A protein has these predicted regions:
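Histidine-acidic metal/acid-base catalytic patches
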Residues: 45-59, 70-189
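Active-site acidic/histidine proton-transfer and metal-coordination neighborhood
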Residues: 1-61
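A cross-family glycoside hydrolase active-site/sugar-binding cleft signature
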Residues: 1, 36-38, 63-65, 91-93, ...
Length: 189
C-alpha cells in the first residue's frame, strides 16, 4: 500500500493529489464534468473528505466503497456519516472481520453476510442524496487478483499502524472493535 511506503510520506502524496486535482478542477468546471475519489483500501474517509473540500465539491465527490473503509479500521456507519454529503457514486460491498492473533483479518462476504448494517448505511446516504444510485461491487478473492495476494490485515494494536491513521478516534476504533468481536462470535459458532 502507498500509505506505508517509506520513500515518500503519505501526507505528501495526499498534498500532491490535491495539487493535481486543483489543476484539473477548472477544466472539469468548463466541461461540466465531475470527478470522484474512492474510499479505497489505502485512503481513509477522512482523507477523501479532505480532498473533496480542498478541490471543491462542485467538481469533486466521493465514490463510497462501503467495505474498503473497514481496512482502515473505520466503522462503516461512522464513515458513511462523514462522506455522505459528498457521495456521488457507490460500491456496495460487505466484509467479515475476525482476529488473526492481535490483528484483524478482512475477508470479503456477500452483502448482508458481513459486518455492515446496510439498513442504516443506506438511510444515511439517502438522506444526503435521494437520487444516489447504489452499485453492488462483486469482489474476487485476493488469491485470484492479477497482482497476487496482498495482506488484508489491520494491525490495530500496533502503535506505528495506528500512527498512520491520525484521524481515527479512540471512540471510533472501539466501535470498530465491537464489530470485530461480534463477527468473531459468529466465526467461533
Amino acid at each position: 500500500y502507498d500509505r506505508f511506503r517509506t520513500d515518500v510520506d503519505w501526507r505528501d502524496q495526499i498534498a500532491a493529489t490535491i495539487k493535481f486535482l486543483k489543476r484539473l478542477a477548472p477544466i472539469a468546471r468548463d466541461l461540466g464534468i465531475h470527478m470522484n475519489i474512492e474510499t479505497h483500501e489505502e485512503i481513509t474517509s477522512f482523507e477523501t473528505v479532505q480532498v473533496v473540500e480542498a478541490v471543491g465539491p462542485e467538481v469533486m465527490g466521493i465514490t463510497f466503497d462501503t467495505a474498503n473503509v473497514l481496512q482502515r479500521a473505520e466503522h462503516p456507519i461512522w464513515a458513511a456519516r462523514r462522506v455522505a454529503p459528498y457521495v456521488r457514486q457507490s460500491h456496495i460491498k460487505d466484509a467479515g472481520l475476525g482476529y488473526e492473533g492481535p490483528h484483524v483479518r478482512y475477508q470479503m462476504r456477500p452483502c448482508g453476510m458481513g459486518v455492515i448494517d446496510f439498513g442504516e448505511l443506506v438511510e444515511i446516504l439517502h438522506r444526503a442524496n435521494p437520487d444516489l444510485h447504489l452499485s453492488i461491487e462483486i469482489d474476487q478473492s485476493r488469491d485470484e487478483m492479477p497482482l497476487g495476494k496482498y495482506p488484508s490485515v489491520m494491525e490495530i494494536t500496533d502503535a506505528s499502524w495506528l500512527a498512520g491513521h491520525p484521524d481515527l478516534t479512540k471512540e471510533e476504533l472501539e466501535a470498530y472493535v465491537e464489530l470485530v468481536q461480534a463477527y468473531q462470535k459468529l466465526i467461533d459458532g
